[in-house]
């Protein structure tokens, strides 16, 4: 298949070997670049754009970069050249007028304030970027920052010498990572148990240790006020070196309904992949193996989940409730933004609790202040859903209809003991999640 290279917002400049795209007549293709791009997933080798992204809103830019990631082949690059907000502000502070303004006949500029407002608002500018902001929105939608480049320079010959605007002070090359596992890969998976209640801990631990995928780290971060968890664990540590135990400081134990314990599990995990396991839940023996196999099926998978079977205190099956019913009749790849919008519109977490999901640790490393946050706000009550939404913005999900986890309902669950408080926190969290995704243009 011939390589496809796109030149977005080409204006009157056409590149040989590229599909030159603009809204104006004369381009190879006339397209509205704020709408979905008409290329199949993983079909494009590279994308170039100079002095276009600042002419659309932040939300439209996020969607455009999401589309670029979708259509790029793994390893493909999108190169964005745009004015540098940091330089614009420095010019204002230093009372410097760039020669480019004079070249275009703007010798009448009177003062730095006038020049700054021109940079922000003239020529249809809607949103200017510095390196931090442009890098952030690229990572948000699943692209990796490959390099910040100087004008005309690139490690890829096809992008060299392309810039023609002296004010292209910010040039970033993003790369689409290769997320697909090879069939014979055996990555290290951390099964992370944020332990607190010892009642069902032994059963949870045994379900982790009995996994058919054996390249495991079983990490226990212990929030239990006493020594019950450690005592149970000592029996297993003697015979299984995959177990790693961390006792949380007494001053943080149980804090924020266990949220801090989840985040310690995340930080301490050594595996490429993380599989949370609540101390009262269970995993099917083939859970990790089946979920890893799903990562071999497509390029853009960031999250694998499955149906979870509700059980009672004795391990007996309970009937499904709305959120635990399988949303599909057979195993399915579900596009991330579509799934996220469905969840936020319906108000139902069909992906599941932390026990339900397998994901790469690195995918959430850029979320601040931590992966259970959204829009900079640490969340409780829907903290797991915050993680899933970040992952869905970066790629697609796979839902497996086989029940690979067992979600235990009992009277001592946090949701039961602190029901009213958890409900209020969840309601606040849903509002934060919905507002963020709407503001970023990730849902209508």
Residue ranges and their predicted role:
Residues 191, 324-420:
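Conserved nucleotide-sugar donor-binding catalytic segment
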